[in-house]
């Protein structure tokens, strides 16, 4: 980062820098500690150049808005516009999955800055009489949507037919207990949820009228997904153990509530 602003920095590192983005995410998901050593030499720099550095909006939050706008009782003709969403190929898999299921999700602009790809995404209601369709998603696709996995599972509960969400081999052992915990919550809706070593198999319902007493446990991602489900079901009871959700996604639940009431809602990332 300092080099980007003109500082004379020499850096040598070993550890995380030798890992790909996918490998880093897998190790984090596995709970492994990534050790690294580094050597930094900073020479005198007389002038630091002011430059703009932009960080795209979070993909997980964007996916939460997309799922709720798709399955929730959003006012007719509302358009949800998500600004500056991270569209890097290693992170945008969940939005692609939703589109394949039939969600009305469109990338209306795409930009690149500092090596990151980001853009604006619009979500509209599915056409009247239609619903999400069950799909099979391979390990390679899910590898780009690991943090959004619980949100895709919620969407699958509304899908027609069977949805298969295959987990990459490297994280199956670590994700199995999380998937079992998630499945306990999703089954409260009446959806059929099978938990297997290689992921979840979900047979959705045309209409979900039941479902409450959801518990986010110790996972911010599961808590966020269940919050989306609870809002879609218009539950009065809050999801339990939401502290981790608020810590990782501050204020997101209040913003999500606006999806169901605001017209032409626009969210800036």
Mark where each language-model region is.
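Short, structured segments at the rim of ligand-binding sites
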Residues: 1-269
